[in-house]
C-alpha cells in the first residue's frame, strides 16, 4: 500500500520540491499540500494522510500549534523541517514535545554531502514514519504515551541486517532465524529481578524518537542517581546544546552537553555533542570523556557504537547499556563488545518505539537481556541501579 503524504509549507518552492522528491519514490504519494498550519489541520482531518511534513514558521498558524491540534484530534506521524539555528533547535524541540516524531534540516545541503543522499534520506524518513505506530505527545513532565493503531495494510518490514563495522551500518532489518531465539518480547519491569551488579555507568543510545524517550526516562530519575549517564542521541550540532539545556531544566539530575576532559560524576548525564564522537577513558578510579571529531567516513556523529565500544574497554562488565528507538543499527556492534566484556544490554520494545531499528538490531543479534516498554524503562533502570 502506498504511503500517502501531506506537505505543509508556506514556500511554494519548498512545497513543490518536497512533493517532487516524495513522488519519485514508488512507495510514496503526495495527496495534498497546505500553505499554513490552519490548512494543515483541516486537510489532516479530511485526507487522513499517513505522514505529514511540516514547516515551523508559517503565517495564520505556525507548525507547532498545528502539530498540537493534529495530535489532539487526528494523530498522524509528523516530520518537521527546521533551520539549523539556536532558535530553530528550540522550536523543533517544542514541536517534538507537541507530538512530532522526527525532524530534518530544511536546507538539504545541511543533511547530506550530495543531492542523491538528501533525496534518499527524506524518502527513508517518510517511509519509516509511515510504517510505524504513532503516539499521543508526552507532557513536558513525561506523561505516559498512548499507542494508536498504525494505518491498516502498511508493511512494517525492513531490509535484512548486514555485516557492519562500528558506526557505519544503516541496516535495520531482522533475520528470522535469529529472532526466534532473541528476547524481542516485552518484559514488564515488575518481572525484572535486579542483578545486584555494581555498575560504573549507564549508557543510553537512540535516534528517531529519542528526544521524547530520553525526556520520559530521565525526568523520573532522582538527583541521587548513583552513576554517571552517557547519552548518545543522533542530532545535529546546532541542536544538542538546546536539548541538553532543556533536559537539565526538566530533570532532577544534572544534564549537560559533554565537553572534552569532563570527569564523570554520579547523578550527571552527559549528552554527546552533535557532529562529534564521545568516548570514555579510565585511569585508576577517575573516568573522563574524550570528545573528538572522529573519522569523516562515519555515518553517525555521534555514534552509539563508538561510545559503547570505548565504555567496554574503560568499564569492562560494569556498564548498563540501553538502546532506545531509532532508525538503523547503530549500537549493535558496540553492544556486542559490551556483551563480550560482561556488561548488561537492554533494548526498547517494538510496541513503544517510533522506529524499531536500533533496538531490533540489538535484540535480533541476541545481545539484549530484555526488551522493555518505554513506559517502564525508567522503573527498570532504577531497580537495576539499586534505586528501585
From Swiss-Prot:
GO cellular component term of the entry, any: cytoplasm
InterPro entries to which the protein is assigned, alphabetical: CheB-like, CheB_C, CheY-like_superfamily, Sig_transdc_resp-reg_Me-estase, Sig_transdc_resp-reg_receiver
Keywords, in A-Z order: Chemotaxis, Cytoplasm, Hydrolase, Phosphoprotein
Domain Response regulatory: 4-121
Disulfide bonds: none
Record-listed E.C. numbers: 3.1.1.61, 3.5.1.44
Reaction equations catalysed: [protein]-L-glutamate 5-O-methyl ester + H2O = L-glutamyl-[protein] + methanol + H(+); L-glutaminyl-[protein] + H2O = L-glutamyl-[protein] + NH4(+)
Record's compositionally biased regions (Polar residues): 174-189
Domain named CheB-type methylesterase: residues: 188-388
Reported modifications of this chain: Phosphorylated by CheA. Phosphorylation of the N-terminal regulatory domain activates the methylesterase activity.
Residue list for modification 4-aspartylphosphate: 55
Family affiliation: Belongs to the CheB family.
Domain-level remarks: Contains a C-terminal catalytic domain, and an N-terminal region which modulates catalytic activity.
HAMAP family in the cross-refs: CheB_chemtxs (MF_00099)
Protein name: Protein-glutamate methylesterase/protein-glutamine glutaminase 1
Name of the encoding gene: cheB1
Amino acid at each position: 500500500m502506498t504511503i500517502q503524504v501531506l506537505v505543509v509549507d508556506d514556500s511554494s518552492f519548498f512545497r513543490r520540491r518536497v512533493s517532487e522528491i516524495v513522488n519519485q519514490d514508488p512507495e510514496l504519494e503526495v495527496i495534498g499540500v497546505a500553505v499554513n498550519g490552519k490548512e494543515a489541520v483541516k486537510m489532516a482531518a479530511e485526507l487522513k494522510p499517513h505522514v505529514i511534513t511540516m514547516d515551523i514558521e508559517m503565517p495564520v498558524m505556525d507548525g507547532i500549534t498545528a502539530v498540537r491540534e493534529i495530535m489532539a484530534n487526528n494523530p498522524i506521524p509528523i516530520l518537521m523541517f527546521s533551520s539549523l539555528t539556536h532558535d530553530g533547535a528550540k522550536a523543533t524541540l517544542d514541536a517534538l514535545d507537541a507530538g512530532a516524531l522526527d525532524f530534518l534540516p530544511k536546507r538539504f545541503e545541511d543533511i547530506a554531502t550530495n543531492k542523491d543522499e538528501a533525496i534518499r534520506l527524506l524518502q527513508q524518513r517518510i517511509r519509516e514514519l509511515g510504517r510505524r505506530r504513532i503516539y499521543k505527545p508526552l507532557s513536558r513532565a513525561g506523561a505516559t504515551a498512548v499507542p494508536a493503531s498504525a494505518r491498516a495494510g502498511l508493511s512494517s518490514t525492513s531490509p535484512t541486517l548486514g555485516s557492519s563495522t562500528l558506526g557505519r551500518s544503516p541496516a535495520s532489518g531482522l533475520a528470522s532465524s535469529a529472532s526466534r531465539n532473541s528476547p524481542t518480547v516485552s518484559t514488564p519491569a515488575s518481572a525484572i529481578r535486579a542483578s545486584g551488579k555494581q555498575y560504573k555507568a549507564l549508557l543510553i543510545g537512540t535516534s528517531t524518537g529519542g528526544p521524547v524517550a530520553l525526556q520520559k526516562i530521565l525526568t523520573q530519575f532522582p538527583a541521587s542517581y548513583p552513576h554517571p549517564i552517557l547519552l548518545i542521541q543522533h542530532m545535529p550540532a546546532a541542536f544538542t546544546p538546546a536539548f541538553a539545556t532543556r533536559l537539565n531544566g526538566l530533570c532532577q539530575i544534572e544534564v549537560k552537553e559533554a565537553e572534552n576532559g569532563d570527569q564523570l560524576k554520579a547523578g550527571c548525564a552527559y549528552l554527546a555533542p552533535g557532529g562529534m564522537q564521545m568516548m570514555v577513558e579510565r585511569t585508576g578510579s577517575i573516568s573522563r570523556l574524550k570528545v573528538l571529531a572522529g573519522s569523516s567516513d562515519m555515518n553517525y556523529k555521534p555514534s552509539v557504537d563508538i561510545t559503547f565500544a570505548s565504555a567496554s574497554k574503560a568499564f569492562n562488565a560494569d556498564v548498563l547499556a540501553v538502546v532506545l528507538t531509532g532508525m538503523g543499527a547503530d549500537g549493535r556492534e558496540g553492544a556486542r563488545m559490551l556483551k563480550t566484556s560482561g556488561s548488561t544490554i537492554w533494548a526498547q520494545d517494538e510496541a513503544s518505539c517510533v522506529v524499531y531499528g536500533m533496538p531490533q538490531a540489538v535484540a535480533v543479534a541476541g545481545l539484549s537481556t530484555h526488551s522493555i516498554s518505554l513506559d517502564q524503562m525508567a522503573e527498570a533502570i532504577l531497580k537495576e541501579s539499586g534505586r528501585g
